[in-house]
């Protein structure tokens, strides 16, 4: 689906090469997921895992960015979201490369022997607090179903020695997540702090961890320039996806 032939549709988000319906998912397509899907390092990967796939956004973005030989497994606990992810993937150019699994990631991994070069997750980060409108949204927002230590343990169980585990989190939560990951034997290899504009402090952080030690590359990404248009850096990162960029 090219930019010129794409048609804007309701109840979802239209990208240059695919459409993501999200009306049956607790968490909608947003900047966090788009950032993560565009940013995660994909060079040389052969097998990818999306933990908490939701609408299938990250799996679809990885499919667009990788070669036809790369297989992507997308695991989602909530049945309605998993069904919608499957529908989105079936309508995409990469249906044969993405496998959707309706499952608890911890239970699913006990049945797997394959290891992944890239693991990606846009995880819950709220502690239990204000009640959500639906159980599905609570599951997507809060760490009660899969807390951060469990998420890091799951990733460690199935990642290759040189693989990357990538997440996007609020800045302060990301700092705590990093401390936890380091204490569990992970090594931080990539970090991008994301700010809305030059005048704002970073509000999100993109993190890539690996079992293998090495230099950590850190940078800063500003989403909008002084004119409130998308910055050159944000445009370069995401223009393969946004319809009118």
From Swiss-Prot:
Enzymatic reactions: adenosine(37) in tRNA1(Val) + S-adenosyl-L-methionine = N(6)-methyladenosine(37) in tRNA1(Val) + S-adenosyl-L-homocysteine + H(+)
GO biological process entries: methylation; tRNA processing
Enzyme class: transferase
Enzyme Commission identifier(s): 2.1.1.223
Pfam families noted in UniProt: MTS (PF05175)
GO molecular function, one term: nucleic acid binding
Name of this protein: tRNA1(Val) (adenine(37)-N6)-methyltransferase
Organism: Shigella sonnei (strain Ss046)
